[in-house]
């Protein structure tokens, strides 16, 4: 499928997020993705945006990670980082986020609880470009443009081999 300008495409396999520009161009950002069992894939939209978000871990995250605070205020110690895009399916909050991070050393890894993390600088740049209602396409494992599955997201998934 060919995505329209303003769409976010997440290629979890390659660990990149693309913000689609006019004329078939895109801005590419390095990302941290969710562990396979925790990752989101499919079509969604940006339901809301927040600068310096707070973080309230879900019960599942509390069980999985153990001793973590029930709430983290905005700021440099908040794992949500500088900006957050809230991913919705229809009018339902999926609880998945595209957000900054206070751990930029993990960009390129698959260690999150499902969210897509960017450096804080990249999160600010993306936040300033994206509108509420923008389409979010998260490619399923094996559907991205990685060495193990060389497909191209912007040309309808045609093989490049």
Q: Whereabouts are the PLM-identified features?
A:
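Cell wall/extracellular polymer interaction/catalysis modules
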Residues: 1-60
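Exported/periplasmic cell-wall-interacting domains
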Residues: 3, 28, 37-38, 42-43, ...
């Amino acid at each position: 499928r060919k995505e329209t300008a303003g769409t976010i495409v997440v290629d979890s396999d390659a660990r990149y997020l693309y913000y689609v520009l006019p004329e078939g161009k895109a801005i590419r950002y390095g990302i941290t993705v969710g562990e396979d069992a925790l990752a989101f894939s499919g079509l969604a939209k940006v339901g809301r945006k927040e600068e310096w978000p707070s973080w309230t871990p879900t019960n599942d995250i509390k069980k999985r990670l153990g001793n973590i605070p029930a709430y983290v205020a905005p700021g440099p110690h908040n794992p949500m980082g500088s900006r957050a895009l809230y991913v919705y399916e229809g009018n339902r909050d999926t609880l998945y986020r595209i957000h900054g991070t206070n751990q930029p050393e993990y960009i390129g890894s698959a260690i999150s609880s499902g969210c897509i993390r960017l450096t804080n600088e990249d999160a600010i740049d993306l936040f300033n470009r994206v509108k509420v209602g923008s389409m979010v396409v998260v490619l399923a494992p094996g559907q991205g443009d990685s060495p193990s599955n060389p497909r191209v997201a912007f040309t309808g998934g045609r093989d490049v081999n």
